[in-house]
Structures are given as structure tokens and as C-alpha cells.
Swiss-Prot record:
This is NADH-quinone oxidoreductase subunit C. The keyword Cell membrane applies. HAMAP family: NDH1_NuoC (MF_01357). Keywords: Cell inner membrane, Cell membrane, Membrane, NAD, Quinone, Translocase, Transport, Ubiquinone. The gene is nuoC.
Amino acid sequence: MMMTRLETLKNNLQAAFGQDLALTESLGELTLEVAAEQWFSACTKLRTDPALRFESCIDLCGVDYLTWGNGTQPEEKTGPVTRGRYAVVVHLLSIEHNWRLRVRTWAPDDEFPMVSSLLECWPGVNWFEREAFDLYGIVFEGHPDLRRILTDYGFIGHPFRKDFPLSGTVEMRYDPEQKRVIYQPVTIDPREITPRVVREDSYGMGR
């Protein structure tokens, strides 16, 4: 009986990583968990191993798990199940073998999240890492030009963090007296957003 492509990839990952392999499967997709200290070496192996050959990194992003497991519905309140607050995720493609893989690592320090840059492994992640730094504040050690890429250079904070205020912290406007754009604290009154109430399936029945 012939193995499927997914089974072949599983076996090849097992052979490459041995006891260090932490692999999960969901919806026909594989996710490889890698410790932060092995992030660069593991990704290098994924790219260079002839049995894997993930020569293309099609996406890199940050994730903030601050409120993970705290849903609005009772059945969604599973509590924290993560290894940390911030994660970095890459989606890889092997053109040679025609398969894909998701790889995730966790920043060990929630106060100063930092992982190794993958720029030497996949040069195309340059702006991806800058975006994750800009939006989440994740530092990529070894990146030669880790600057903001979407927000203004004077922007305060990282807007995709779960605890970033919806109204922001700074606003800018044109000052007719100074005849230039100026920055000032936000003048929007903060407000609490109440989640919508989801009615039960049986609501209104029996009336």
C-alpha cells in the first residue's frame, strides 16, 4: 500500500529530528513545534535536508496568545494552554516535493520576546520579520535592519498586541499655527466594548 504524501513527510521529519520531533496533525496539515534555542538550526535543516527541502518560506507572522482560551462562551473557556505569550509561525513550501509545513516556536521571555532571525535561511523573510517586530514587538536577533515597516517611526507600542488600547496612545493632526503635522495624546474617550450576546438555539421555542 502506497503512503500518502503527508505520511511520507511525517516519516521524513521523524528521521530528521528523531526524539526532538514535536508534531501535530489537524485538518490534513502538519505543525512542527520547535524550541526557541533550536529555531534557526531546525529551520536550516528543513531547508537543506534532501528528504525535506523546504526551499521557500511563504509566510512568517507573530501571534499573541494573551487571551487564548478565554472565550465569551462557557464552553470556550479552556484556560491557558500555551508555552508562552508570543509565538512566531512560519509556513514552508517544498517545491521539489510538493508539500507544506507549519513551524512554530515560542519566545521564552514575555517581557522581551526574542527569537533568532531566519534571514540567512530564507532571505525573503526580511520584511516579514520587520512586520512581526512592528506589530507585536518580537525582536529577531541577527536581523540587520529591524525597523518599523507599517506604522510611523514615532509610533508608540505595538498595535497587534492584545493589550494595546483600541484608541491607541498618540494621534496626529495638522496644527494651523505651527503649519505642520504634530503628535499629541489621543483625545478619544476610551470605552468598554461589550461582546454581543449569542442566543441559545432553543431561544423563543415553546412560546
